[in-house]
Regions:
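Solvent-exposed, non-transmembrane regions of membrane-associated and secreted proteins
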Residues: 1-171
Length: 171
């Protein structure tokens, strides 16, 4: 299955994970990390790095559920270390990622600590490129927080063969 995400510069990006059947349109209009209300969409955070860049986090987000229905965030939380994720952009560039950690929870109640933690994961603009999937988790508390936690899954660019192609990226 695939997830399709649309970027203002590179329309038609497809994200696939062969171990699960998923298919959604993407949304990258917001400059804030807010999942699309449309459950058929997964959002790419427009201020994050593009997939396969030399550095920074490439961030995608989805609701875990919305209006009583499950969304793609409910799939994010099932990912496990070693699961493959492949991204193909509209130009045919293919990026291979491997999940590097089981999902972990960032509690949002202490905003100072939360901000520090997100700068090391979600908002990271240096270090090697990683794919970061973000959804909500924990108890629903309402208000500005919604859920008490964010659930984070990160994936690193996969090693490639010795063909000279940038690691994790096909020509």
């Amino acid at each position: 299955g695939t997830i399709t995400t649309v970027d203002n510069q590179q329309n038609g990006t497809r994200v696939s994970a062969p171990w699960i059947a998923i298919d959604a349109q993407g949304d990258s209009q917001a400059a804030t990390l807010a999942p699309p209300e449309d459950l058929t969409k997964v959002g790419w955070y427009g201020r994050s790095a593009w997939f396969g860049q030399d550095k920074g986090s490439s961030v995608m987000t989805s609701h875990i559920n919305y209006a009583g229905k499950a969304s793609y965030g409910s799939i994010f939380i099932t990912l496990r270390k070693g699961d493959p994720i492949t991204i193909t952009d509209s130009k045919g560039n293919v990026y291979h990622y491997v999940v590097e950690n089981d999902p972990f929870y960032l509690n949002k109640s202490n905003q100072e600590e939360y901000k520090k933690q997100t700068q090391n994961t979600i908002n990271k603009m240096n270090g090697e490129n990683k794919l970061v999937l973000v959804t909500c988790g924990g108890a629903y508390v309402g208000g500005n927080l919604g859920y008490e936690d964010n659930v984070i899954v990160s994936a690193k660019l996969a090693n490639n063969d010795k063909s000279g192609v940038k690691a994790g990226k096909d020509k």
